[in-house]
Design a protein with these regions (language model features):
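Helix N-terminus capping/helix-initiation residues
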Residues: 10, 64, 119, 187, ...
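Amphipathic, soluble alpha/beta structural segments
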Residues: 68-96, 195-197, 295-297, 336-352
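Short, structured secondary-structure boundary patches
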Residues: 3-29, 136-138, 189-199, 237-239, ...
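Short, charged low-complexity intrinsically disordered segments located at boundaries
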Residues: 43-47, 98-106, 133-137, 159, ...
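Glycine-rich anion/phosphate-binding loop at the beta-strand->alpha-helix junction
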Residues: 146-311
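Catalytic-core signal marking the mid-to-C-terminal active-site face
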Residues: 1, 306-353
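Catalytic alpha/beta active-site cores
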Residues: 4-176, 180-185, 189
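Generic secondary-structure signature for well-ordered alpha-helical cores
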Residues: 19, 23, 73-80, 107-114, ...
Length: 353
C-alpha cells in the first residue's frame, strides 16, 4: 500500500525469504576463537549491552572514553562474557561516536565486537574498519543490528543500515522491543504476536538484500510498562516470560535467537542479584543463543564494572546447572563404593578424589 507507506508480505513470500536464513550464527573473535550458536548448534553466549551511564559508587554518571576502555578490558578478562557492545560515550560527538567507540573496543579486546549505530553519518568509517578487522575471515569478529520502531515500523535509518552492511556475510540482529501497554498490547501474548511479526519482517528484508546472511531473531528485548511509574521494566517476571517464549518462536523458524537480561536495581544490590540470577537462568534454560545485558542495571540505562563481575559469576553457575550430572562408571565411583571399607575411611587421599 504505497499511499499508506505499508508493505504486506504473504506467508509464501515470507517463508521463501526465510528459507535462506542460516539456522546457526558464528561469532568470530580476533583471538582466533569462534562461538557457533543457533537453532541447530544450541549454546548460549553473553554480551554486555548499550548503556548511557556508568554506576560509580552510589552515583551514576555519563560514560567517558576512559570508562569505556576499562569496561572493555574487563570484558576481555571475563570467562563467561564472549563479546563487547558499544555504549554512549559522552566524550565523542554524535557524528563520530560510533566509529570512535568501535576503535576503542578493537584496541582493548580481542573478543567479538558489536558496535551500536546511532547515526548513519559514521557508517562508512565503521564499515571501512569492519573490512580491515574481518579481512579474509569467514567468521566475522564484528556484527550489527538495529531495532524496529514499535508498532511495526522499520525506519529509513534501519533500512539503510541493513543495506549498507549487506554483501559481506556479517551477522545482523533484528530487534523488536515491544513495551507491553505502551507500544504493544498490554497482554503478553499480544505483545509477542506483534514482536514476532516485527522480527520476521526484518529478517525477510535482510534475506531479500543478501540471501543466506546470518540473522538473529530478537523478540527478547521485550519490556512491560509500569503503569504507576511509567518505567519500562527489564527485570520483571513478565519480561522473562516473553523472552523465553520468543526463543520458542525462533526455533519454529529454525533461527538463532537473542534476548536481554537487566534489572530495575540502581546499584549492585540484592534486587539486582535476584533479578539477574533469575533472568540469566531462565533465558539460558529456554535456549536463548545470545543474551545481552551483562553488567547492566537501572532498566538497561546503566552499566557497572562490579555488576559485570557478579554477572560473570552468575553465568558460570548457570552454565554448571546446564551441564547437569554425569552418570557413568567413573562418576558413579564404583571403585570407591565397592572398595574395602578401610579404604573408604580416607577419601581425601583416594586416587578417585
Amino acid at each position: 500500500d504505497e499511499g499508506a507507506g505499508r508493505v504486506y508480505l504473504t506467508e509464501d513470500v515470507l517463508r521463501g525469504l526465510l528459507a535462506d536464513a542460516p539456522a546457526d550464527v558464528r561469532f568470530g573473535q580476533r583471538t582466533g576463537d569462534t562461538h557457533t550458536v543457533g537453532a541447530c548448534a544450541g549454546g548460549t553466549v553473553r554480551w554486555p549491552g548499550n548503556a548511557l551511564y556508568l554506576v560509580d559508587g552510589a552515583q551514576r554518571r555519563t560514560l567517558t572514553a576512559d570508562d569505556f576502555a576499562r569496561l572493555t578490558r574487563l570484558v576481555d578478562r571475563l570467562d563467561n562474557v564472549q563479546g563487547m557492545v558499544g555504549v554512549s560515550v559522552g566524550d565523542f560527538e554524535p557524528t563520530v561516536r560510533d566509529f570512535c567507540t568501535l576503535r576503542l573496543m578493537a584496541q582493548h579486546t580481542g573478543k567479538h565486537l558489536r558496535p551500536v549505530i546511532t547515526s548513519l553519518s559514521g557508517v562508512d568509517a565503521v564499515m571501512e574498519m569492519t573490512d580491515v578487522l574481518a579481512a579474509g575471515r569467514d567468521d566475522s569478529p564484528i556484527s550489527f543490528g538495529y531495532s524496529v520502531v514499535s508498532p511495526l515500523r522499520w525506519t529509513a535509518t534501519a533500512l539503510q543500515l541493513i543495506q549498507r552492511t549487506s554483501g559481506r556475510g556479517l551477522p545482523f540482529m533484528f530487534n523488536a522491543e515491544p513495551l507491553a501497554g505502551g507500544t504493544s498490547p498490554v497482554t503478553l501474548a499480544g505483545s509477542l504476536a506483534q514482536a514476532h511479526a516485527e522480527t520476521l519482517s526484518g529478517i525477510a528484508i535482510g534475506q531479500a538484500l543478501e540471501p543466506g546472511r546470518p540473522c538473529l531473531y530478537n523478540a527478547g528485548f521485550a519490556h512491560t510498562l509500569d503503569m504507576k511509574s511509567a518505567v519500562a521494566l527489564g527485570g520483571s517476571a513478565e519480561v522473562f516470560l516473553m523472552a523465553t517464549a520468543s526463543a520458542d518462536l525462533a526455533r519454529r523458524w529454525s533461527l538463532p535467537c537473542s534476548s536481554w537480561v537487566s534489572s530495575e536495581g540502581m546499584t549492585e544490590d540484592a534486587q539486582a542479584a535476584a533479578e539477574k540470577s533469575m533472568g540469566l537462568t531462565l533465558h539460558t534454560q529456554a535456549g536463548v543463543n545470545l543474551v545481552w545485558g551483562m553488567g547492566q542495571l537501572e532498566s538497561q540505562m546503566s552499566i557497572s564494572l562490579e555488576q559485570l563481575v557478579i554477572d560473570d559469576e552468575i553465568a558460570a553457575q548457570v552454565d554448571r546447572l546446564q551441564r547437569g550430572i554425569t552418570v557413568d562408571d567413573e562418576h558413579l565411583a564404583r571403585q570407591v563404593l565397592l572398595a574395602d571399607p578401610a579404604e573408604r575411611g580416607d577419601l581425601l587421599a583416594h586416587e578417585h578424589t
